UniProtKB/Swiss-Prot annotation:
MF terms in GO: GTP binding; GTPase activity; translation initiation factor activity
Gene3D superfamilies, per the entry: 1.10.10.2480, P-loop containing nucleotide triphosphate hydrolases, Translation factors, Translation initiation factor IF- 2, domain 3
Binding site for GTP: 226-233, 272-276, 326-329
Region annotated G4, chain positions: 326-329
Localisation per UniProt entry: Cytoplasm
Biased composition (Basic residues): 101-113
Domain named tr-type G: residues: 217-386
Protein name, as recorded: Translation initiation factor IF-2
Alphabetized UniProt keyword annotations: Cytoplasm, GTP-binding, Initiation factor, Nucleotide-binding, Protein biosynthesis
Species whose genome carries this gene: Bacillus subtilis (strain 168)
Low complexity bias locations: 114-126
Superkingdom assignment: Bacteria
GO CC, any one term: cytosol
Pfam family membership, one: IF2_N
Amino acid sequence: MAKMRVYEYAKALNVSSKEILTALKNMDLEVNNHMAMLEEKAIKKLDAKYKKGGARAKSQKPAETNKNKQPQGVNQQSAGNQPNKIRDGKKNDVQNNQFNKNKKNNNNKKNKRNNNNNKNQHQQKPVKPKKELPEKITFSGTLTVGALAEELGKEPSELIKKLMLLGVMATINQELDKDTIELIASEYGVETEEVIVLEETELEKYEEPDNEEDLEIRPPVVTIMGHVDHGKTTLLDSIRKTKVVEGEAGGITQHIGAYQIEENGKKITFLDTPGHAAFTTMRARGAEVTDITILVVAADDGVMPQTVEAINHAKAAEVPIIVAVNKIDKESANPDRVMQELTEYGLVPEAWGGETIFVPLSALTGKGIDELVEMILLVSEVEELKANPNRQAKGTVIEAELDKGRGSVATLLVQTGTLHVGDPIVVGNTFGRVRAMVNDIGRRVKTAGPSTPVEITGLNDVPQAGDQFLVFKDEKTARSVGEARASKQLEEQRSDKAKLSLDDLFEQIKQGDVKDINLIVKADVQGSAEALTAALQKIEVEGVKVKIIHTGVGAITESDIILASASNAIVIGFNVRPDGNAKSTAEAENVDIRLHRIIYKVIDEIEAAMKGMLDPEYEEKVIGQVEVRQTFKVSKIGTIAGGYVTEGTITRDSGLRLIRDGVVIFEGEVDVLKRFKDDVKEVSQGYECGITIKKYNDIREGDILEAFVMQEIERT
């Protein structure tokens, strides 16, 4: 007789597994669960039980019951009533109908009972059909472990085990980021695709499409880039016929300015990006909104690191480059060298058969300026720059700051549409109504068309430089979208800590014990705060990392000092000062405030502080050697070595290494150093001395005692 599992035997008898388990227990046969295997002995006992008496009805299968019962009834009916059926057909028909009806009802009841039994069996049966792996899964944002398991057709427990093997402790409801989803999917050979869903907070959802016939010619937006001190701001001043360069601290443009000029009835908008390497993020932002890049290179300096950086930004933005070779009025100027150097970066002059326009000029004397403006207009005509002025305005934040008198002030570049005073507007995660607009020369305006820079007030908060803005039809929608975007940003900031990321895990493993230098950065404008933060985070000193606790715009306040005190941070003020309350709180809380106006000094000072925080690096220096010639054992003191200084000097505060037959036996410190009976600080070469080693007595004749000191190495 073949072996069977409990549930298989129960299914054969059309009874529940629970009933079979109870019966086995009554027979003193121990079976764990419905999946247990029944031995031949157990099957015989069960057969004996279920083939007798009251259990007989349950022991027969429905098909067998119907098969046996139906022929028996039919045969009896046909054998006993055959003559009556012939004599009284009508009566027999009624009886047969009644019999069939009863039989049908009985069968229905049995079928219903059988269905219920089958249902119970299905509920007890844990084995699910194996789902095939999909070729590809799609997701949006994040997925929980449970949701990913469902997508892959796997049990959540299996995914949790995989994550544990990767060193990640996760629950079924833990959210996984994109990288983790892709990693787990790749383990099963499944492709992934992230679907970008436009939410209610996405500005693109509210943007109106433009028709080709509505587009009109717009002014070009020109970005001036180049190395520090190559004359970018001077060039812009020369074009605008003004002098603002003298007001810049350290001769460096501290934040982006946007200006507009008019030449022969045609307008040109200029963005002045700072040239210092610390403002890389601001320069990149300038390249994103620009149509033409003017690369300023000094004829006497040639190509410098920031020049190459500017070329890369312009190429990444896929915008045409016009090279302005500045300072040609200097005696050391060599424009041909500049042209030669730039060919290495793919900028070949038209005169040499290339496509790049080179304009030699002097920003100081004004020579070549007219030709440069003419070239800008020529390139803009070729580019066919167009926008629809008859729609709701859309554009980018160039700069933003908090003004004491006017509140939140943002410099916007309108890229399409026309901005009006009174327009409901969403700017990044802020919203409001345009209360006032001022153009680049300080005059109030009521409208601003495409490629026009304006300064606006009326926002509920300070936006981030580089944020997108969009005008809405009504203030209610603008408020609701702005509040939703702000809430979403807050949730994302909170969830950044809770969300699972393999990157964080690997970083922690790589970093080990890392010291932090906590900083709070306050600046005059948002762009400077961002650029300074980016520069500080790029400082690399082994063993120490920069942690920016908070960045903000405006004066250093009491709340900044309280935050610094709680997080043990240093406050960096860039072009801002602490107010009275902040000063007194800083003194009381002993918080360090550092105020600067030049980026160089901030970086240098913080770098020096970081180097000071590191555990010092030491180098061992051997200063002397003693040969042990005799030993003396003294109670309460231990072993005293009588020795002769063969090399250098031995001092009382030096380290001591006991060497026997060329092998280091012990390393410790000098306990007592004597010359005759007197304690001495040091003993020089050629003299005898008595010496004991702290917490060590096994000194023998012929041993060598090597004295050494640890010298601190200055970090570079």
